Curated annotation (Swiss-Prot):
GO terms for molecular function: ATP binding; magnesium ion binding; shikimate kinase activity. InterPro entries: P-loop_NTPase, Shikimate/glucono_kinase, Shikimate_kinase/TSH1, Shikimate_kinase_CS. It catalyses: shikimate + ATP = 3-phosphoshikimate + ADP + H(+). The lineage of its organism: Bacteria, Bacillati, Cyanobacteriota, Cyanophyceae, Oscillatoriophycideae. Its main location: cytoplasm. The keyword Nuclease does not apply. This is Shikimate kinase. Substrate binds at D41, R65, G87, R143. ATP binds at G19, S20, G21, K22, S23, T24, R124, R160. Mg(2+) binds at S23. It comes from Rippkaea orientalis (strain PCC 8801 / RF-1). Monomer. Binds 1 Mg(2+) ion per subunit. GO terms for biological process: amino acid biosynthetic process; aromatic amino acid family biosynthetic process; chorismate biosynthetic process. It comes from the Bacteria.
């Protein structure tokens, strides 16, 4: 059965650490499924007319997380969408009520690879500390058990292209979504 038909329009939520490739992979996945693509961080910046960094600095992480939940609730009302979420979206239990209405895919990336990807990134407010490896390990420890609640886990290593990761996701979706049996199949 074709993956699109199997999905029946449900949303796909990409979760994982910052730098895991949620936005890059999400855009390609949405294209392949003929879905819309949303990035919750970009939506937050549009709604607030501030950068994520500025929200953290001027209003704090708690306010940011509240805005993030509001944005997630609004995008969850859409269908046929791939949604790249912020790395900490899993921390709020209310967010899980929205995520569970779709297919949750965790992009699992090693700390070593994340460090390589994020070493020169100055836009991430949670990475302002001097020891990037320690900060990433701490965030990973806080979130790993929550990420593990995903319907599907895709392990990403350095040698993979975004296209190959999307192909793996598309091949794996039928293993976690079972086709609905239609009543007329038994007539």
């Amino acid at each position: 059965m074709k993956t699109q038909k199997l999905l029946q329009g449900i949303n796909i939520y990409l979760i994982g650490m910052m730098g895991s490739g949620k936005s890059t992979i999400g855009k390609i996945l949405a294209q392949r499924l003929d879905y819309r693509f949303f990035d919750t961080d970009i939506l937050i910046e549009r709604v607030t007319q501030q950068s994520i960094n500025d929200i953290f600095v001027t209003q704090g992480e708690t306010v940011f997380r509240d805005i993030e939940t509001q944005v997630l609730s609004e995008v969850a009302a859409c269908t046929r969408s791939v949604i790249a979420t912020g790395g900490g979206i899993v921390l709020n239990s209310q967010n899980w009520s929205y995520l569970h209405h779709g297919l949750i895919i965790w992009l699992d990336v090693s700390i070593k690879l994340l460090k390589t990807r994020l070493i020169n990134d100055t836009t991430r407010p949670l990475l302002k500390e001097s020891d990037l490896t320690l900060k990433l390990k701490t965030l990973d420890e806080q979130r790993r058990n929550l990420y593990n609640k995903a319907d599907l886990t895709i392990v990403i290593n350095q040698n993979r292209t975004p296209e190959s990761i999307v192909s793996e996701i598309l091949e794996a979706i039928p293993t976690v979504i079972k086709p609905k049996v239609e009543a007329n199949q038994f007539n």
